[in-house]
Amino acid sequence: MRRLIVLFAAALAVLGATAPALAAPKTETAVFAGGCFWCMEHDMQGVPGVLKVESGYTGGHLKNPTYRDVTSETSGHYEAVRVTYDPAKLDYGFLLYRYWRLVDPTDDGGQFCDRGPSYRPAVFVTPAQRPIAEKSRTEAAKRLKTGTMKTQILPAQTFYLAEEYHRDYAKRNKLNYFAYRTGCGRDARLKQVWGG
């Protein structure tokens, strides 16, 4: 019996020693607006170190906005994505680098075929993220093939999740998504802005 108690105690000690290794990784978030959140969500998913990408709304004055509120252009909100990532595998600077190549930062009237304030590009930052974002914007502006940088860097605000039917849209509606993306001219314009 005594031997069984010792073995049980040893097993608990081993399990306790490995508990930190089993703990969830520390995560951080980044919030980006870049026109249609379907496209931003799709293009940020699959980046190594990105754990989750969620479509939603931010930057406005209306609490709990709906898609209709946002696209009516009366709420002040942007269509945006919240990217949750593992900072041990991916840094914020790389996410910014990726972001710039997914948007036309020279267009402050919307993005591609989506027009209006809710479709403008913007980076929403915490105080710690601001200097990194500002430096990244300056570097990105030097690489533009056409136009001048107009994308704003704004203070992070409450992020409201979009309605369920907007989330993971590209995965659930592949044909509609790619028809929209192609018809909107997103990829063609990105080649003009960034080259390649």
UniProtKB/Swiss-Prot annotation:
InterPro entries associated with the record: Met_Sox_Rdtase_MsrA_dom, Met_Sox_Rdtase_MsrA_sf
SUPFAM superfamilies in the cross-refs: Peptide methionine sulfoxide reductase
EC numbers on record: 1.8.4.11
Reactions catalysed, as given in the entry: L-methionyl-[protein] + [thioredoxin]-disulfide + H2O = L-methionyl-(S)-S-oxide-[protein] + [thioredoxin]-dithiol; [thioredoxin]-disulfide + L-methionine + H2O = L-methionine (S)-S-oxide + [thioredoxin]-dithiol
BP GO annotations: protein modification process
GO molecular function per UniProt: L-methionine:thioredoxin-disulfide S-oxidoreductase activity; peptide-methionine (S)-S-oxide reductase activity
Keywords in alphabetical order: Oxidoreductase
Enzyme class name: oxidoreductase
Active site, UniProt feature: 36
Top-level taxonomic group: Bacteria
Pfam families in UniProt: PMSR
Record-stated family: Belongs to the MsrA Met sulfoxide reductase family.
NCBIfam families cross-referenced by the UniProt entry: msrA
Function description: Has an important function as a repair enzyme for proteins that have been inactivated by oxidation. Catalyzes the reversible oxidation-reduction of methionine sulfoxide in proteins to methionine.
Name of this protein: Peptide methionine sulfoxide reductase MsrA 2
